[in-house]
Amino acid sequence: MPPKPTNWRMYGKMAVAGLTCCVGGPALIYYISPTEEELFLKYNPELQKRSLENRVGKQEDFDNFVARLKEYSKSDRPIWVEAEEAARKKRSGKIEEQAKLMQEMQQRKEEIKKSGTNLMPGGSL
């Protein structure tokens, strides 16, 4: 029995369909997706004003975030480990700061007690 002939018509249809899906799909999405400017113009005036006011702050936050990511990526360890360690250091720094404030408050109370000033809660000066 001779081998079956190659069905070039079927392979051609499959190639055209695959090319249409692979190229046409993203092209269609690119064509129908609105730009940031078009979305901004669809906002009501109050939202446009608020968005313009918050734009600088959001940009600064994003820049800080990217700077931190660059700093974390300098290490050999994964970024999430570095971020967790930085958060832990920040928390411990806040705890130490709170402890210092409490100690200063205690010292002030002791100074007031030693000076002999009698403070009454709710009293007038």
UniProtKB/Swiss-Prot annotation:
Principal subcellular localization: mitochondrion
Q: Where in the cell is it found?
A: Mitochondrion inner membrane
- Topology of this chain in the membrane: Single-pass membrane protein
- GO biological process per UniProt: mitochondrial respiratory chain complex III assembly
Q: Which InterPro entries match?
A: Cbp4
Task: Enumerate the transmembrane spans.
Answer: 10-32
Listed A to Z, the keywords are: Chaperone, Coiled coil, Membrane, Mitochondrion, Mitochondrion inner membrane, Transmembrane, Transmembrane helix
Gene Ontology CC annotation, any one: mitochondrial inner membrane
Coiled coil, from the record: 92-119
Spell out the residue ranges making up region: Disordered: 103-125
What is the similarity comment for this entry? Belongs to the CBP4 family.
PANTHER family (UniProt xref): ASSEMBLY FACTOR CBP4
* Function according to Swiss-Prot or TrEMBL: Essential for the assembly of ubiquinol-cytochrome c reductase. It has a direct effect on the correct occurrence of the Rieske protein, core 4, core 5 and apocytochrome b.
Name assigned to this protein: Assembly factor cbp4
Which source organism does the UniProt entry give?
Botryotinia fuckeliana (strain B05.10)
Upper classification of the organism = Eukaryota, Fungi, Dikarya, Ascomycota, Pezizomycotina
Q: Which gene encodes it?
A: cbp4
